[in-house]
Amino acid sequence: MEQKYDVIVVGAGHAGVEAGLASARKGAKTLMLTINLDSVAFMPCNPSVGGPAKGIVVREIDALGGQMAKTIDKTHIQMRMLNTGKGPAVRALRAQADKVLYQQEMKSVIEAQDNLDIMQGMVERLIIEDGKVLGVETVIGTTYLADAVVLTTGTFLRGEIILGNIKYSSGPNHQMPSIKLADHLREIGFDIVRFKTGTPPRVNSDSIDYSKTEIQPGDDLPRAFSYETTEFIMDQLPCWLTYTNGETHQVIDDNLHLSAMYSGMIKGTGPRYCPSIEDKFVRFNDKPRHQIFLEPEGRNTKEVYVQGLSTSLPEHVQLQMLKTIPGLEKADMMRAGYAIEYDAIVPTQLWPTLETKKIQGLYTAGQINGTSGYEEAAGQGLMAGINAAAKVLGHDELILGRHEAYIGVLIDDLVTKGTNEPYRLLTSRAEHRLLLRHDNADLRLTEIGYNAGLIDEFRYSRFNNKKAAISEEINRLSQIRIKPNEKTQSMIESRGGTPLKDGILAIDLLRRPEMDYASVVALIEEQGMIDESVQEQVEIQTKYEGYIQKSLQQVEKVKRMENKKIPENIDYDDIHSLATEAREKLKEVKPLSIAQASRISGVNPADISILLIYIEQGKIKRVN
Protein backbone atom coordinates (compact mmCIF):
# COMPACT_ATOMS: atom_id res chain seq x y z
CA MET A 1 0.00 0.00 0.00
CA GLU A 2 1.51 3.33 -1.13
CA GLN A 3 0.18 6.88 -0.77
CA LYS A 4 1.79 10.04 -2.21
CA TYR A 5 2.06 13.40 -0.45
CA ASP A 6 4.07 16.59 -0.93
CA VAL A 7 5.30 16.67 2.68
CA ILE A 8 5.25 14.09 5.48
CA VAL A 9 5.67 15.18 9.11
CA VAL A 10 6.77 12.44 11.51
CA GLY A 11 5.54 13.27 15.02
CA ALA A 12 2.70 15.43 16.35
CA GLY A 13 4.24 17.17 19.34
CA HIS A 14 4.80 20.92 19.50
CA ALA A 15 7.23 20.90 16.55
CA GLY A 16 5.14 18.44 14.56
CA VAL A 17 1.83 20.30 14.73
CA GLU A 18 3.44 23.59 13.67
CA ALA A 19 5.30 21.87 10.82
CA GLY A 20 2.17 20.10 9.60
CA LEU A 21 -0.02 23.19 9.81
CA ALA A 22 2.55 25.45 8.13
CA SER A 23 3.06 23.02 5.27
CA ALA A 24 -0.68 22.52 4.73
CA ARG A 25 -1.45 26.24 4.99
CA LYS A 26 1.15 26.94 2.30
CA GLY A 27 -0.81 24.63 0.02
CA ALA A 28 1.27 21.44 0.21
CA LYS A 29 -0.58 18.13 0.50
CA THR A 30 0.66 17.05 3.92
CA LEU A 31 0.55 13.90 6.05
CA MET A 32 1.21 13.90 9.79
CA LEU A 33 2.18 10.52 11.26
CA THR A 34 2.24 10.03 15.03
CA ILE A 35 2.71 7.07 17.37
CA ASN A 36 -0.43 7.98 19.34
CA LEU A 37 -3.22 10.29 18.18
CA ASP A 38 -4.24 10.81 21.81
CA SER A 39 -0.92 12.57 22.49
CA VAL A 40 -1.08 15.39 19.94
CA ALA A 41 0.70 18.48 21.38
CA PHE A 42 1.07 16.68 24.71
CA MET A 43 2.90 18.44 27.56
CA PRO A 44 4.93 15.68 29.25
CA CYS A 45 6.78 18.13 31.48
CA ASN A 46 5.76 21.58 32.75
CA PRO A 47 2.16 22.66 32.00
CA SER A 48 3.16 26.11 30.79
CA VAL A 49 3.98 28.14 27.70
CA GLY A 50 6.23 31.19 27.49
CA GLY A 51 8.61 32.86 29.91
CA PRO A 52 11.82 34.84 29.27
CA ALA A 53 12.79 34.64 25.56
CA LYS A 54 10.39 31.69 25.10
CA GLY A 55 7.33 33.92 25.39
CA ILE A 56 8.73 36.14 22.64
CA VAL A 57 9.15 33.04 20.46
CA VAL A 58 5.44 32.28 20.92
CA ARG A 59 4.63 35.83 19.76
CA GLU A 60 6.94 35.33 16.76
CA ILE A 61 5.21 32.06 15.87
CA ASP A 62 1.91 33.93 15.88
CA ALA A 63 3.25 36.84 13.82
CA LEU A 64 4.47 34.36 11.19
CA GLY A 65 1.10 32.57 11.04
CA GLY A 66 1.69 29.67 13.45
CA GLN A 67 -0.72 28.17 15.97
CA MET A 68 0.76 27.89 19.48
CA ALA A 69 -0.23 31.40 20.64
CA LYS A 70 -3.87 31.03 19.60
CA THR A 71 -4.18 27.65 21.31
CA ILE A 72 -2.68 28.71 24.65
CA ASP A 73 -4.83 31.87 24.63
CA LYS A 74 -7.91 29.62 24.53
CA THR A 75 -6.76 27.05 27.08
CA HIS A 76 -4.68 28.72 29.80
CA ILE A 77 -5.59 28.83 33.48
CA GLN A 78 -3.33 31.78 34.30
CA MET A 79 -1.27 34.39 32.46
CA ARG A 80 1.39 36.78 33.77
CA MET A 81 3.69 39.35 32.22
CA LEU A 82 7.20 38.83 33.61
CA ASN A 83 9.88 41.48 34.24
CA THR A 84 7.42 44.39 34.11
CA GLY A 85 9.78 46.45 36.27
CA LYS A 86 12.56 46.09 33.68
CA GLY A 87 13.07 47.37 30.16
CA PRO A 88 10.95 46.20 27.20
CA ALA A 89 13.72 43.94 25.84
CA VAL A 90 13.31 41.41 28.66
CA ARG A 91 9.55 41.54 29.24
CA ALA A 92 7.85 38.26 28.42
CA LEU A 93 4.48 36.60 28.82
CA ARG A 94 4.05 33.25 30.58
CA ALA A 95 0.89 31.15 30.74
CA GLN A 96 -0.07 28.16 32.85
CA ALA A 97 -1.79 25.70 30.55
CA ASP A 98 -4.72 23.40 31.06
CA LYS A 99 -2.67 20.66 29.45
CA VAL A 100 -5.63 18.42 28.52
CA LEU A 101 -7.61 21.30 27.00
CA TYR A 102 -4.48 22.44 25.13
CA GLN A 103 -4.13 18.98 23.59
CA GLN A 104 -7.80 18.78 22.68
CA GLU A 105 -7.84 22.25 21.12
CA MET A 106 -4.69 21.60 19.08
CA LYS A 107 -6.05 18.25 17.89
CA SER A 108 -9.26 19.98 16.76
CA VAL A 109 -7.20 22.53 14.83
CA ILE A 110 -5.15 19.96 12.91
CA GLU A 111 -8.23 17.81 12.24
CA ALA A 112 -9.99 20.81 10.67
CA GLN A 113 -7.00 21.93 8.57
CA ASP A 114 -7.33 21.64 4.77
CA ASN A 115 -4.52 19.77 2.96
CA LEU A 116 -3.56 17.95 6.19
CA ASP A 117 -4.15 14.23 6.76
CA ILE A 118 -3.44 12.73 10.18
CA MET A 119 -2.58 9.07 10.70
CA GLN A 120 -1.56 6.99 13.69
CA GLY A 121 1.52 4.98 12.85
CA MET A 122 5.15 4.46 13.85
CA VAL A 123 7.77 5.23 11.22
CA GLU A 124 10.71 2.83 11.31
CA ARG A 125 12.75 3.93 8.29
CA LEU A 126 13.15 6.55 5.60
CA ILE A 127 13.02 5.70 1.92
CA ILE A 128 16.14 7.24 0.37
CA GLU A 129 17.51 7.09 -3.15
CA ASP A 130 20.58 8.88 -4.54
CA GLY A 131 20.87 11.06 -1.45
CA LYS A 132 17.25 12.22 -1.62
CA VAL A 133 14.33 11.29 0.64
CA LEU A 134 11.38 9.71 -1.16
CA GLY A 135 9.14 8.82 1.78
CA VAL A 136 8.79 6.71 4.92
CA GLU A 137 7.89 3.17 5.91
CA THR A 138 5.98 2.25 9.10
CA VAL A 139 6.44 -0.75 11.39
CA ILE A 140 3.45 -2.48 9.76
CA GLY A 141 4.97 -2.11 6.30
CA THR A 142 2.88 0.78 4.99
CA THR A 143 4.78 3.09 2.65
CA TYR A 144 4.03 6.79 2.29
CA LEU A 145 5.83 8.71 -0.45
CA ALA A 146 6.69 12.42 -0.39
CA ASP A 147 9.20 14.90 -1.81
CA ALA A 148 10.00 16.21 1.68
CA VAL A 149 9.94 14.66 5.17
CA VAL A 150 10.12 16.54 8.48
CA LEU A 151 11.25 14.52 11.53
CA THR A 152 9.87 15.90 14.82
CA THR A 153 10.48 12.91 17.06
CA GLY A 154 10.92 14.68 20.41
CA THR A 155 12.42 12.46 23.12
CA PHE A 156 11.08 9.23 21.59
CA LEU A 157 14.26 8.16 19.74
CA ARG A 158 15.66 5.23 21.79
CA GLY A 159 13.94 6.82 24.77
CA GLU A 160 14.73 5.31 28.18
CA ILE A 161 13.11 6.25 31.49
CA ILE A 162 15.34 6.08 34.57
CA LEU A 163 14.09 6.00 38.15
CA GLY A 164 16.63 5.11 40.85
CA ASN A 165 18.32 1.91 39.67
CA ILE A 166 15.49 1.05 37.25
CA LYS A 167 15.87 1.77 33.55
CA TYR A 168 13.51 0.76 30.75
CA SER A 169 12.69 1.65 27.14
CA SER A 170 10.01 4.32 26.98
CA GLY A 171 9.01 7.58 25.41
CA PRO A 172 7.86 10.51 27.58
CA ASN A 173 5.07 9.80 30.06
CA HIS A 174 5.67 6.04 29.68
CA GLN A 175 4.63 5.95 26.01
CA MET A 176 6.07 3.65 23.35
CA PRO A 177 9.62 4.67 22.26
CA SER A 178 10.93 4.77 18.68
CA ILE A 179 13.80 2.30 18.48
CA LYS A 180 14.04 1.28 14.82
CA LEU A 181 13.97 4.82 13.44
CA ALA A 182 16.74 5.80 15.87
CA ASP A 183 18.85 2.85 14.69
CA HIS A 184 18.07 3.72 11.06
CA LEU A 185 19.35 7.30 11.48
CA ARG A 186 22.63 5.94 12.83
CA GLU A 187 22.86 3.43 9.97
CA ILE A 188 22.50 6.10 7.28
CA GLY A 189 25.37 8.07 8.80
CA PHE A 190 23.99 10.78 11.08
CA ASP A 191 26.15 11.80 14.03
CA ILE A 192 24.04 11.15 17.13
CA VAL A 193 24.35 12.43 20.70
CA ARG A 194 22.61 11.21 23.84
CA PHE A 195 20.79 13.81 25.92
CA LYS A 196 18.78 13.63 29.12
CA THR A 197 15.91 15.56 30.60
CA GLY A 198 13.60 14.98 33.54
CA THR A 199 10.31 15.79 35.18
CA PRO A 200 9.14 16.21 38.80
CA PRO A 201 6.44 14.33 40.71
CA ARG A 202 2.77 15.33 40.57
CA VAL A 203 0.73 15.51 43.77
CA ASN A 204 -2.99 15.58 44.60
CA SER A 205 -4.21 19.14 45.19
CA ASP A 206 -6.49 17.99 48.04
CA SER A 207 -3.43 16.82 49.99
CA ILE A 208 -1.69 20.23 49.89
CA ASP A 209 -1.91 22.69 52.79
CA TYR A 210 -1.90 25.92 50.79
CA SER A 211 -1.92 28.05 53.97
CA LYS A 212 1.80 27.27 54.30
CA THR A 213 2.58 28.53 50.78
CA GLU A 214 2.60 31.92 49.02
CA ILE A 215 -0.11 32.57 46.43
CA GLN A 216 1.04 33.47 42.90
CA PRO A 217 -1.97 34.93 41.06
CA GLY A 218 -2.24 35.75 37.37
CA ASP A 219 -2.41 39.33 36.09
CA ASP A 220 -5.64 41.29 36.45
CA LEU A 221 -5.07 42.90 33.06
CA PRO A 222 -6.24 40.93 30.01
CA ARG A 223 -3.24 39.24 28.39
CA ALA A 224 -2.77 37.27 25.18
CA PHE A 225 0.05 35.80 23.10
CA SER A 226 -1.76 36.08 19.77
CA TYR A 227 -2.26 39.40 18.02
CA GLU A 228 -5.64 38.07 16.86
CA THR A 229 -7.08 37.15 20.27
CA THR A 230 -10.10 39.28 21.20
CA GLU A 231 -11.67 37.16 23.97
CA PHE A 232 -9.71 36.89 27.22
CA ILE A 233 -9.89 34.36 30.07
CA MET A 234 -10.29 36.35 33.29
CA ASP A 235 -11.32 33.43 35.56
CA GLN A 236 -7.79 32.37 36.48
CA LEU A 237 -6.36 29.79 38.88
CA PRO A 238 -3.43 30.72 41.14
CA CYS A 239 -0.11 28.92 41.47
CA TRP A 240 1.66 28.64 44.84
CA LEU A 241 5.23 29.11 46.03
CA THR A 242 7.03 27.11 48.71
CA TYR A 243 10.65 26.16 49.41
CA THR A 244 12.91 23.22 50.15
CA ASN A 245 14.81 23.33 53.46
CA GLY A 246 17.60 21.65 55.39
CA GLU A 247 15.47 18.57 56.02
CA THR A 248 14.77 18.20 52.29
CA HIS A 249 18.46 18.52 51.52
CA GLN A 250 19.31 15.89 54.15
CA VAL A 251 16.97 13.40 52.45
CA ILE A 252 18.72 14.11 49.13
CA ASP A 253 22.18 13.79 50.69
CA ASP A 254 21.29 10.51 52.40
CA ASN A 255 20.03 9.03 49.14
CA LEU A 256 22.28 10.63 46.55
CA HIS A 257 23.89 7.26 45.83
CA LEU A 258 20.46 6.04 44.65
CA SER A 259 20.05 8.86 42.12
CA ALA A 260 20.57 7.75 38.53
CA MET A 261 22.29 11.11 38.00
CA TYR A 262 25.13 10.15 40.34
CA SER A 263 25.16 6.35 40.20
CA GLY A 264 26.47 6.34 36.62
CA MET A 265 23.25 4.94 35.17
CA ILE A 266 22.53 8.16 33.23
CA LYS A 267 25.04 8.70 30.41
CA GLY A 268 23.22 11.50 28.57
CA THR A 269 23.95 15.19 29.10
CA GLY A 270 21.23 17.03 31.01
CA PRO A 271 19.92 20.60 30.62
CA ARG A 272 22.08 23.22 32.34
CA TYR A 273 19.17 25.61 32.91
CA CYS A 274 16.67 23.07 34.21
CA PRO A 275 18.70 20.95 36.67
CA SER A 276 17.28 18.17 38.82
CA ILE A 277 16.87 18.80 42.55
CA GLU A 278 19.84 16.47 43.17
CA ASP A 279 21.94 18.55 40.79
CA LYS A 280 20.87 21.80 42.48
CA PHE A 281 21.77 20.35 45.89
CA VAL A 282 25.25 19.32 44.70
CA ARG A 283 26.04 22.40 42.58
CA PHE A 284 24.60 24.98 44.98
CA ASN A 285 25.36 23.34 48.30
CA ASP A 286 25.65 26.72 50.04
CA LYS A 287 21.98 27.56 49.33
CA PRO A 288 19.73 27.01 52.37
CA ARG A 289 16.63 26.58 50.20
CA HIS A 290 15.33 26.33 46.63
CA GLN A 291 12.05 27.62 45.19
CA ILE A 292 9.25 25.14 44.52
CA PHE A 293 6.21 26.26 42.51
CA LEU A 294 2.98 24.29 42.77
CA GLU A 295 1.26 24.53 39.38
CA PRO A 296 -2.23 23.10 38.66
CA GLU A 297 -2.23 20.92 35.52
CA GLY A 298 -5.75 22.01 34.58
CA ARG A 299 -9.23 22.99 35.72
CA ASN A 300 -10.65 19.46 35.75
CA THR A 301 -7.85 17.53 37.45
CA LYS A 302 -6.42 17.31 40.96
CA GLU A 303 -2.87 16.86 39.65
CA VAL A 304 -0.40 19.57 40.64
CA TYR A 305 3.02 19.87 39.00
CA VAL A 306 5.82 20.36 41.57
CA GLN A 307 8.03 22.69 39.55
CA GLY A 308 11.63 22.79 40.76
CA LEU A 309 11.71 19.20 42.00
CA SER A 310 12.71 17.35 38.82
CA THR A 311 14.35 14.11 39.97
CA SER A 312 15.46 10.58 39.12
CA LEU A 313 15.54 9.42 42.77
CA PRO A 314 13.55 6.25 43.62
CA GLU A 315 9.82 6.65 44.18
CA HIS A 316 9.93 6.14 47.96
CA VAL A 317 12.67 8.78 48.31
CA GLN A 318 10.63 11.25 46.23
CA LEU A 319 7.69 10.86 48.63
CA GLN A 320 9.99 11.24 51.64
CA MET A 321 11.47 14.38 50.08
CA LEU A 322 8.03 15.88 49.30
CA LYS A 323 6.88 15.50 52.90
CA THR A 324 9.70 17.75 54.16
CA ILE A 325 8.44 20.74 52.13
CA PRO A 326 6.04 23.23 53.79
CA GLY A 327 2.53 22.60 52.54
CA LEU A 328 3.39 19.12 51.25
CA GLU A 329 3.73 17.32 54.61
CA LYS A 330 0.69 15.17 53.77
CA ALA A 331 1.27 15.10 50.02
CA ASP A 332 -0.38 12.32 48.05
CA MET A 333 1.98 11.64 45.13
CA MET A 334 -0.01 10.74 42.01
CA ARG A 335 2.92 10.36 39.60
CA ALA A 336 6.59 9.95 40.37
CA GLY A 337 9.20 12.10 38.66
CA TYR A 338 11.73 10.47 36.34
CA ALA A 339 14.67 11.15 34.03
CA ILE A 340 14.53 10.29 30.33
CA GLU A 341 17.45 9.74 27.95
CA TYR A 342 17.02 10.02 24.19
CA ASP A 343 18.91 10.36 20.91
CA ALA A 344 19.39 13.68 19.13
CA ILE A 345 21.28 14.52 15.98
CA VAL A 346 24.27 16.87 15.97
CA PRO A 347 22.58 20.01 14.59
CA THR A 348 25.58 21.26 12.62
CA GLN A 349 24.47 18.59 10.12
CA LEU A 350 21.64 20.96 9.13
CA TRP A 351 21.37 23.92 6.79
CA PRO A 352 19.75 27.08 8.23
CA THR A 353 16.50 25.95 6.55
CA LEU A 354 16.62 22.88 8.88
CA GLU A 355 17.13 20.61 5.87
CA THR A 356 19.81 18.00 6.50
CA LYS A 357 23.04 18.36 4.56
CA LYS A 358 23.28 14.61 4.17
CA ILE A 359 19.85 13.88 2.65
CA GLN A 360 18.04 16.26 0.34
CA GLY A 361 14.40 16.90 1.29
CA LEU A 362 14.83 15.65 4.88
CA TYR A 363 14.20 18.22 7.62
CA THR A 364 14.39 17.93 11.40
CA ALA A 365 12.82 20.10 14.11
CA GLY A 366 12.48 20.17 17.89
CA GLN A 367 14.25 18.05 20.47
CA ILE A 368 15.77 15.83 17.79
CA ASN A 369 17.95 18.89 17.06
CA GLY A 370 19.19 19.09 20.65
CA THR A 371 16.86 21.75 22.03
CA SER A 372 14.69 21.74 25.15
CA GLY A 373 11.29 23.37 25.55
CA TYR A 374 7.93 23.38 23.81
CA GLU A 375 8.44 26.88 22.41
CA GLU A 376 11.85 26.17 20.86
CA ALA A 377 10.35 23.05 19.29
CA ALA A 378 7.32 24.89 17.93
CA GLY A 379 9.46 27.64 16.40
CA GLN A 380 11.65 25.10 14.62
CA GLY A 381 8.62 23.10 13.51
CA LEU A 382 7.08 26.18 11.93
CA MET A 383 10.28 26.99 10.01
CA ALA A 384 10.84 23.38 8.91
CA GLY A 385 7.23 23.12 7.71
CA ILE A 386 7.49 26.39 5.77
CA ASN A 387 10.77 25.35 4.13
CA ALA A 388 9.75 21.76 3.37
CA ALA A 389 6.60 23.00 1.62
CA ALA A 390 8.54 25.76 -0.13
CA LYS A 391 11.02 23.24 -1.51
CA VAL A 392 8.26 21.05 -2.94
CA LEU A 393 6.15 23.93 -4.28
CA GLY A 394 9.09 25.84 -5.75
CA HIS A 395 8.74 28.81 -3.40
CA ASP A 396 11.55 30.81 -1.79
CA GLU A 397 13.03 29.26 1.35
CA LEU A 398 12.83 31.24 4.61
CA ILE A 399 15.81 31.89 6.88
CA LEU A 400 15.29 34.38 9.71
CA GLY A 401 18.27 36.53 10.70
CA ARG A 402 19.53 36.92 14.25
CA HIS A 403 18.33 40.53 14.12
CA GLU A 404 14.83 39.52 12.97
CA ALA A 405 13.70 36.94 15.52
CA TYR A 406 14.65 34.80 18.50
CA ILE A 407 13.74 31.90 16.20
CA GLY A 408 16.57 33.11 13.96
CA VAL A 409 18.97 33.21 16.91
CA LEU A 410 17.93 29.70 17.95
CA ILE A 411 18.40 28.11 14.54
CA ASP A 412 21.63 29.97 13.79
CA ASP A 413 23.10 28.87 17.14
CA LEU A 414 22.17 25.25 16.43
CA VAL A 415 23.42 24.97 12.85
CA THR A 416 26.50 27.19 13.30
CA LYS A 417 27.74 26.40 16.82
CA GLY A 418 25.98 23.13 17.64
CA THR A 419 25.25 22.23 21.25
CA ASN A 420 26.73 19.76 23.73
CA GLU A 421 23.70 19.92 26.06
CA PRO A 422 19.94 20.43 25.66
CA TYR A 423 19.75 23.97 24.24
CA ARG A 424 17.53 26.52 25.94
CA LEU A 425 16.83 29.92 24.46
CA LEU A 426 17.86 32.86 26.69
CA THR A 427 17.65 36.62 26.12
CA SER A 428 21.43 36.75 26.66
CA ARG A 429 21.95 34.67 23.49
CA ALA A 430 20.54 37.49 21.33
CA GLU A 431 22.98 40.32 20.59
CA HIS A 432 20.12 42.44 19.15
CA ARG A 433 17.61 41.79 21.93
CA LEU A 434 16.41 45.40 22.09
CA LEU A 435 15.07 44.83 18.57
CA LEU A 436 13.57 41.42 19.45
CA ARG A 437 10.91 42.47 21.91
CA HIS A 438 7.61 40.94 23.03
CA ASP A 439 5.73 44.04 21.89
CA ASN A 440 7.03 44.27 18.31
CA ALA A 441 6.96 40.68 17.02
CA ASP A 442 4.18 41.60 14.59
CA LEU A 443 6.10 44.60 13.24
CA ARG A 444 9.13 42.37 12.68
CA LEU A 445 7.50 39.32 11.17
CA THR A 446 3.94 39.76 9.87
CA GLU A 447 5.17 40.91 6.45
CA ILE A 448 7.41 37.83 6.29
CA GLY A 449 4.52 35.55 7.30
CA TYR A 450 2.31 37.17 4.65
CA ASN A 451 4.93 36.64 1.93
CA ALA A 452 5.31 33.02 3.08
CA GLY A 453 1.57 32.49 2.56
CA LEU A 454 0.55 32.03 6.20
CA ILE A 455 -1.07 35.42 6.94
CA ASP A 456 -4.43 36.16 5.27
CA GLU A 457 -5.40 39.43 3.60
CA PHE A 458 -7.66 40.61 6.44
CA ARG A 459 -4.93 40.24 9.06
CA TYR A 460 -2.34 41.79 6.75
CA SER A 461 -4.60 44.81 6.18
CA ARG A 462 -5.05 45.29 9.96
CA PHE A 463 -1.29 45.05 10.41
CA ASN A 464 -0.67 47.76 7.79
CA ASN A 465 -3.27 49.98 9.44
CA LYS A 466 -1.47 49.59 12.78
CA LYS A 467 1.89 50.46 11.21
CA ALA A 468 0.39 53.57 9.63
CA ALA A 469 -1.25 54.61 12.92
CA ILE A 470 2.08 54.37 14.78
CA SER A 471 3.83 56.51 12.18
CA GLU A 472 1.00 59.08 12.11
CA GLU A 473 0.93 59.43 15.91
CA ILE A 474 4.71 59.90 16.14
CA ASN A 475 4.45 62.57 13.43
CA ARG A 476 1.54 64.25 15.26
CA LEU A 477 3.44 64.40 18.57
CA SER A 478 6.47 65.77 16.71
CA GLN A 479 4.45 68.79 15.57
CA ILE A 480 2.54 69.69 18.75
CA ARG A 481 4.18 72.16 21.12
CA ILE A 482 3.24 72.00 24.81
CA LYS A 483 3.33 75.26 26.76
CA PRO A 484 4.84 75.49 30.27
CA ASN A 485 1.50 76.45 31.83
CA GLU A 486 0.26 75.55 35.30
CA LYS A 487 -1.33 72.25 34.17
CA THR A 488 1.87 71.13 32.44
CA GLN A 489 4.20 72.10 35.30
CA SER A 490 1.92 70.45 37.86
CA MET A 491 1.82 67.21 35.83
CA ILE A 492 5.62 67.11 35.46
CA GLU A 493 6.31 67.93 39.13
CA SER A 494 3.78 65.32 40.32
CA ARG A 495 5.80 62.72 38.42
CA GLY A 496 9.12 63.84 39.93
CA GLY A 497 10.35 65.75 36.88
CA THR A 498 12.05 69.13 36.44
CA PRO A 499 9.63 71.95 35.45
CA LEU A 500 9.85 73.35 31.92
CA LYS A 501 11.61 76.65 31.25
CA ASP A 502 10.11 76.97 27.81
CA GLY A 503 7.66 75.24 25.49
CA ILE A 504 8.52 71.71 24.34
CA LEU A 505 7.44 69.36 21.55
CA ALA A 506 5.16 66.60 22.81
CA ILE A 507 7.51 63.95 21.41
CA ASP A 508 10.45 65.43 23.37
CA LEU A 509 8.39 65.54 26.56
CA LEU A 510 7.59 61.85 26.05
CA ARG A 511 11.34 61.13 25.93
CA ARG A 512 11.64 62.20 29.57
CA PRO A 513 11.96 59.12 31.83
CA GLU A 514 9.23 60.27 34.23
CA MET A 515 6.61 60.79 31.49
CA ASP A 516 4.48 58.20 29.74
CA TYR A 517 2.22 58.41 26.70
CA ALA A 518 -1.01 58.90 28.67
CA SER A 519 0.38 61.78 30.75
CA VAL A 520 1.77 63.59 27.69
CA VAL A 521 -1.44 63.21 25.68
CA ALA A 522 -3.44 64.49 28.68
CA LEU A 523 -1.70 67.84 28.14
CA ILE A 524 -2.82 68.04 24.50
CA GLU A 525 -6.18 69.54 23.55
CA GLU A 526 -6.84 67.12 20.66
CA GLN A 527 -6.15 63.80 22.34
CA GLY A 528 -7.51 61.44 19.66
CA MET A 529 -8.57 57.80 19.99
CA ILE A 530 -5.48 55.62 19.71
CA ASP A 531 -5.39 51.83 20.12
CA GLU A 532 -3.43 50.64 23.20
CA SER A 533 -0.97 48.62 21.11
CA VAL A 534 -0.27 51.74 19.03
CA GLN A 535 0.24 53.81 22.19
CA GLU A 536 2.71 51.21 23.47
CA GLN A 537 4.74 51.32 20.24
CA VAL A 538 4.79 55.13 20.14
CA GLU A 539 6.10 55.24 23.71
CA ILE A 540 8.75 52.51 23.33
CA GLN A 541 9.98 53.71 19.93
CA THR A 542 10.27 57.27 21.25
CA LYS A 543 11.90 56.55 24.62
CA TYR A 544 14.39 54.01 23.26
CA GLU A 545 15.01 55.70 19.90
CA GLY A 546 18.72 56.28 20.51
CA TYR A 547 19.39 52.72 21.65
CA ILE A 548 17.29 51.27 18.84
CA GLN A 549 19.22 53.32 16.25
CA LYS A 550 22.54 52.03 17.64
CA SER A 551 21.26 48.46 17.39
CA LEU A 552 20.11 49.05 13.81
CA GLN A 553 23.56 50.39 12.90
CA GLN A 554 25.12 47.21 14.30
CA VAL A 555 22.64 45.15 12.27
CA GLU A 556 23.66 46.97 9.08
CA LYS A 557 27.30 46.03 9.71
CA VAL A 558 26.32 42.38 10.17
CA LYS A 559 24.12 42.49 7.06
CA ARG A 560 27.11 43.53 4.97
CA MET A 561 28.88 40.41 6.23
CA GLU A 562 25.76 38.30 5.61
CA ASN A 563 25.66 39.58 2.03
CA LYS A 564 29.19 38.29 1.45
CA LYS A 565 28.19 34.79 0.40
CA ILE A 566 30.58 31.84 0.45
CA PRO A 567 30.41 29.93 -2.85
CA GLU A 568 28.96 26.42 -2.55
CA ASN A 569 31.89 24.95 -4.46
CA ILE A 570 34.61 26.28 -2.15
CA ASP A 571 37.34 23.81 -1.19
CA TYR A 572 38.71 24.75 2.24
CA ASP A 573 41.64 22.34 1.82
CA ASP A 574 42.85 24.62 -0.96
CA ILE A 575 43.18 27.57 1.47
CA HIS A 576 46.53 26.64 2.99
CA SER A 577 46.77 29.67 5.31
CA LEU A 578 43.70 28.65 7.33
CA ALA A 579 44.32 27.27 10.83
CA THR A 580 43.69 23.52 11.00
CA GLU A 581 40.82 23.86 13.49
CA ALA A 582 39.18 26.57 11.39
CA ARG A 583 39.43 24.42 8.25
CA GLU A 584 37.84 21.45 10.02
CA LYS A 585 35.00 23.55 11.46
CA LEU A 586 34.31 25.29 8.14
CA LYS A 587 34.15 21.94 6.35
CA GLU A 588 31.75 20.61 8.99
CA VAL A 589 29.36 23.58 9.21
CA LYS A 590 29.60 24.71 5.54
CA PRO A 591 28.58 28.31 6.34
CA LEU A 592 26.57 30.18 3.72
CA SER A 593 28.07 33.62 4.46
CA ILE A 594 31.10 35.31 5.97
CA ALA A 595 28.92 36.42 8.90
CA GLN A 596 27.90 32.83 9.66
CA ALA A 597 31.52 31.68 9.34
CA SER A 598 32.58 34.33 11.87
CA ARG A 599 30.17 32.87 14.45
CA ILE A 600 31.65 29.36 14.31
CA SER A 601 33.54 28.39 17.45
CA GLY A 602 37.19 27.84 16.53
CA VAL A 603 37.18 30.23 13.55
CA ASN A 604 39.05 33.39 14.55
CA PRO A 605 39.22 36.86 12.89
CA ALA A 606 42.50 35.99 11.15
CA ASP A 607 40.84 33.00 9.49
CA ILE A 608 37.96 35.22 8.35
CA SER A 609 40.41 37.70 6.80
CA ILE A 610 42.15 34.89 4.92
CA LEU A 611 38.80 33.52 3.74
CA LEU A 612 37.67 36.98 2.55
CA ILE A 613 40.86 37.55 0.56
CA TYR A 614 40.60 34.09 -1.00
CA ILE A 615 36.99 34.66 -2.11
CA GLU A 616 37.55 38.25 -3.32
CA GLN A 617 40.53 37.14 -5.44
CA GLY A 618 38.27 34.57 -7.07
CA LYS A 619 40.47 31.63 -6.12
CA ILE A 620 37.60 29.15 -5.93
CA LYS A 621 38.59 25.58 -6.66
CA ARG A 622 35.65 23.47 -7.78
CA VAL A 623 35.01 20.37 -5.69
CA ASN A 624 34.88 17.17 -7.72
Curated annotation (Swiss-Prot):
Keywords tagged on the record: Cytoplasm, FAD, Flavoprotein, NAD, tRNA processing
An example Gene Ontology biological process: tRNA methylation
Binding of NAD(+), residues: 270-284
Cofactor requirements of the protein: FAD
One Gene Ontology term, aspect cellular component: cytosol
Highest taxon in the source lineage: Bacteria
NCBIfam families noted in UniProt: mnmG_gidA
Free-text function comment from the UniProt entry: NAD-binding protein involved in the addition of a carboxymethylaminomethyl (cmnm) group at the wobble position (U34) of certain tRNAs, forming tRNA-cmnm(5)s(2)U34.
Family according to the record: Belongs to the MnmG family.
UniProt protein name: tRNA uridine 5-carboxymethylaminomethyl modification enzyme MnmG
Origin organism lineage: Bacteria, Bacillati, Bacillota, Bacilli, Bacillales
